[in-house]
Amino acid sequence: MTGASTTTATMRQRWQAVMMNNYGTPPIALASGDGAVVTDVDGRTYIDLLGGIAVNVLGHRHPAVIEAVTRQMSTLGHTSNLYATEPGIALAEELVALLGADQRTRVFFCNSGAEANEAAFKLSRLTGRTKLVAAHDAFHGRTMGSLALTGQPAKQTPFAPLPGDVTHVGYGDVDALAAAVDDHTAAVFLEPIMGESGVVVPPAGYLAAARDITARRGALLVLDEVQTGMGRTGAFFAHQHDGITPDVVTLAKGLGGGLPIGACLAVGPAAELLTPGLHGSTFGGNPVCAAAALAVLRVLASDGLVRRAEVLGKSLRHGIEALGHPLIDHVRGRGLLLGIALTAPHAKDAEATARDAGYLVNAAAPDVIRLAPPLIIAEAQLDGFVAALPAILDRAVGAP
């Protein structure tokens, strides 16, 4: 049921007829993309400043990803986890090298960030301890284990009781973290920047303090880099800005350049916790997704996109702050993961007026607009957004 009669209106009707209502009905239906531009079924174009929520680090239809996926699919599409393939091994080798730990590091592949965090949850149980510590307002996924770690009652309460012995503490509060971690704590789960809660950046030294606290108590430090990894903040892993090495890192989103793949990297003793039969994933390490991820890693390196994310992010942040718009309180984040904090809860309105103006953004909180564009976005496209932002915000609050 596609063709000339397909419009946003008809697509919305078809969606409502067959899709579960967990997302509501999307306001537009997209048909194609190229670079940082997407086109809807009505032929209207938008600058994509959300990148599939930090997924499309190379934008849409990147030739390197297309070539890698096409070549691999024409050779070997899927094998299950019963057999080894070159793309999976090569991808694990590259991720281990990028993490750069001075101890043995091992990788488990899965399909998403939630699955990567579930794997980390299970690793923590294998320490022989059961207590976990995470942050209020954190987001680690919606499967039951990752949901238990997610510090958002609105998402948790409908599904209670949740697994685990999880204590939530204030994000960025070193004293609260130290008080919560004891000799029974298996792991502390933290995001280097809390993306889903409004691009919340912790105080300087927080991650280093968390590393010290967990090391002293013999607990694992698990860093959820699902949104902050893949060069988005100006370092391949956001925690590398702090010069620390966690015990476990989870990764997904941008790793596959649009294809579903997640990874759980474990360092040192944590790398030896899983033994045959304790965990698995039918699709994890799928050679097509792994080939796509290898292509993403190589383009990030060859095109200098990690450093570029840092430079463009600073320019974008300064440009927005320089507007001096009364609805803008401040801009926070790092690299090309930014949150425009507003003086009033108009982020959802601004998401809609930005879309009307041809820009896709996201209301990560009632008063925060999240930006997570492709790392290949042109500077001129970002400049265009900055120029359009005052009118977008004015319309969001009903100003003439």
Curated annotation (Swiss-Prot):
UniProt keyword terms in alphabetical order: Acetylation, Amino-acid biosynthesis, Aminotransferase, Arginine biosynthesis, Cytoplasm, Isopeptide bond, Pyridoxal phosphate, Transferase, Ubl conjugation
InterPro entries per UniProt: AcOrn/SuccOrn_fam (IPR004636), Aminotrans_3 (IPR005814), Aminotrans_3_PPA_site (IPR049704), Class-III_PLP-dep_AT (IPR050103), PyrdxlP-dep_Trfase (IPR015424), PyrdxlP-dep_Trfase_major (IPR015421), PyrdxlP-dep_Trfase_small (IPR015422)
| GO molecular function terms attached to this record | identical protein binding; N2-acetyl-L-ornithine:2-oxoglutarate 5-aminotransferase activity; pyridoxal phosphate binding
Coiled-coil intervals in this record?
Answer: none
Which residues are annotated as modified residue N6-(pyridoxal phosphate)lysine in the UniProt record? 253
Q: Which cofactor does it need?
A: pyridoxal 5'-phosphate
CDD domains noted in UniProt: OAT_like
Keyword Flavoprotein included in the entry's annotation: no
Reading the lineage from the top rank, the first entry is Bacteria
What subcellular compartments does it reside in? Cytoplasm
Recorded protein name is: Acetylornithine aminotransferase
State the organism named in the record: Mycobacterium tuberculosis (strain ATCC 25618 / H37Rv)
